[in-house]
Amino acid sequence: MKVTSRALGEVLYVYLEGEIDECSVNCVRREVDESIENHAMAQKVIVNLANVSFMDSTGIGFLIGRYKKIQRYGMSMYIESPNFTADKVLAVSGIYTLIPKL
């Protein structure tokens, strides 16, 4: 799993690539949390899932956990460009009612 992040103005973009599953989630969580903490002045966090090749319920839990953390900082969170497979998992879970898709 690869995590890349960059801040542009008041927006923190987080790009995830690979599989979000039980084996990778702890490393991904640490990297994303560190990026959020380093950019605590951002107003929005946009998580790009275009290159996520696999995601199960562990990925949903990961996103909800990041959403809660981001809320504590007073930021908004959005999901961007989920691929077809990730989009199906997220839509069925109902997560888009909590974290809007761009």
Where are these regions (language model features)?
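Absolute protein N-terminus
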Residues: 1-2, 102
